[in-house]
């Protein structure tokens, strides 16, 4: 089996359905004999350019270990899910289990926001 990193851009109006979507995709992976190594919810972020007249999207990063049949099934599910604006699948040499650089940035932004809120209070 190969290791993959999948980045998903979800429609911002569908943010509340993200956990259900994620569980469905994780179920597809484990049913096919794969493993989910890391799931990161990067939240809503500003887009560099507009996609389908949208300026923001909800980002997810998933690191998995799966075979080609499972990947084909996932790609098919991404294409026909209207809530998925874009998806990117990258083949990795090994499983990434630590936090990504993007997740470190998200955590740093959250810490800065809480610090500002405490300072203003």
Swiss-Prot record:
GO biological process: translation
Gene3D superfamilies registered for this protein in UniProt: 3.30.70.60
Skewed-composition ranges (Basic and acidic residues): 105-115
A cellular-component GO term for this protein: cytosolic small ribosomal subunit
Keyword Cell cycle belongs to the record: no
Keywords, in A-Z order: Ribonucleoprotein, Ribosomal protein, RNA-binding, rRNA-binding
A Pfam cross-reference name: Ribosomal_S6
Domain of life: Bacteria
Cited CDD domains: bS6
Residue span of region Disordered: 96-121
Keyword NADP: no
InterPro entries (alphabetical): Ribosomal_bS6, Ribosomal_bS6_sf, Ribosomal_S6_plastid/chlpt, Transl_elong_EF1B/ribsomal_bS6
Family per record: Belongs to the bacterial ribosomal protein bS6 family.
Known role: Binds together with bS18 to 16S ribosomal RNA.
Protein known as: Small ribosomal subunit protein bS6
Species per Swiss-Prot/TrEMBL record: Albidiferax ferrireducens (strain ATCC BAA-621 / DSM 15236 / T118) (Rhodoferax ferrireducens)
Upper taxonomic lineage: Bacteria, Pseudomonadati, Pseudomonadota, Betaproteobacteria, Burkholderiales
């Amino acid at each position: 089996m190969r290791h993959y990193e999948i980045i998903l851009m979800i429609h911002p109006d569908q943010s509340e359905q993200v956990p259900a979507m994620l569980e469905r995709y994780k179920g597809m992976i484990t049913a096919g004999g794969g493993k989910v190594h890391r799931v990161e919810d990067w939240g809503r972020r500003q887009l560099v350019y507009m996609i389908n007249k949208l300026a923001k999207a909800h980002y997810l990063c998933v690191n998995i270990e799966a075979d080609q049949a499972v990947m084909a099934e996932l790609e098919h599910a991404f294409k026909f899910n209207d809530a998925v604006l874009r998806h990117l699948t990258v083949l990795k040499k090994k499983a990434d289990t630590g936090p990504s650089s993007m997740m470190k940035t998200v955590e740093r932004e959250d810490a800065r926001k809480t610090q500002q809120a405490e300072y203003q209070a």
